[in-house]
């Protein structure tokens, strides 16, 4: 009888489910719906779990955070912020606490509050898997610094990305951004020419030469700019937007120079790609 008078024991006794693995199974279902793009379905599932396991504050907080993510993906930012404001962070277990930081960062980035997002990304980053999301979070941090014009911090963060053995695409974009952050055009071109020699970037040569061309163009050096644009067009292995951009930029320069014979085929090929 003494046990029944204990409030914690009474709450435990009144719960509907005594197997905590069932809650995990439900959460996995909600996550699966989210990752399949069924955001409303996942919101419904997480709301059900939160009601069913109202006695478990960690489960409730987890569900609320996934609801925030789903609302944010649908662009329902007011609803997302409303739910986020109700999350009791102290109720999250140590294992799930980083989820609050990553969800907060995601919402702040989606609502273009980049500076506010930085501390949350920095908190979430060390808790991500080294071979999973950590390189991606490090890359996002670098982008946020770059968006806030913190060039040195951005360059340092991008260099950290390169040490994390990221995907080929992320490696390429990080190197490209490092080059673009160089204050000296000569140093930027030197870094970009190093990228040309890396075999793993052979399918992105159009982007690299295009960026070199842009550096020269910013210096009003149209001769070297066109030389690199033409090289990028010749080396392109994919009929994608990168090649189309170079063709249009080269076409614009030729047009301004009244070299219509060279401008016309550039525009024509770009139109076929787009």
Enumerate the predicted regions with their spans.
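Acidic, polar-rich low-complexity tracts and alpha-helical solenoid repeat scaffolds
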Residues: 1-274
């Amino acid at each position: 009888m003494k046990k029944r008078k204990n409030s914690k024991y009474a709450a435990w006794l009144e719960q509907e489910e005594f197997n905590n693995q069932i809650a995990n199974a439900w959460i996995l279902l909600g996550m699966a719906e989210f990752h399949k793009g069924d955001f409303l379905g996942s919101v419904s599932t997480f709301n059900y779990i939160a009601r069913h396991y109202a006695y478990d504050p960690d489960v409730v907080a987890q569900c609320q955070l996934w609801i925030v993510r789903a609302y944010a993906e649908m662009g329902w930012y007011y609803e997302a912020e409303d739910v986020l404001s109700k999350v009791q962070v102290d109720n999250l277990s140590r294992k799930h606490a980083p989820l609050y930081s990553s969800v907060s960062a995601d919402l702040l980035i989606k609502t273009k509050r980049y500076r506010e997002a930085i501390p949350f990304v920095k908190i979430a980053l060390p808790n991500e898997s080294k071979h999973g999301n950590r390189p991606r979070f490090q890359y996002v941090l670098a982008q946020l610094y770059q968006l806030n014009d913190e060039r040195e911090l951005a360059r340092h963060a991008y260099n950290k990305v390169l040490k994390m053995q990221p995907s080929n695409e992320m490696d390429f974009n990080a190197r490209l951004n490092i080059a673009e952050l160089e204050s000296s055009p000569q140093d930027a071109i030197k870094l970009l020419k190093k990228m040309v020699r890396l075999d793993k970037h052979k399918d992105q040569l159009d982007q690299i030469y295009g960026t070199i061309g842009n550096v020269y163009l910013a210096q009003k050096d149209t001769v070297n700019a066109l030389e690199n644009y033409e090289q990028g067009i010749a080396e392109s292995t994919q009929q994608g937007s990168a090649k189309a951009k170079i063709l249009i930029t080269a076409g614009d320069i030729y047009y301004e120079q009244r070299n219509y014979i060279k401008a016309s085929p550039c525009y024509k090929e770009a139109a076929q790609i787009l």
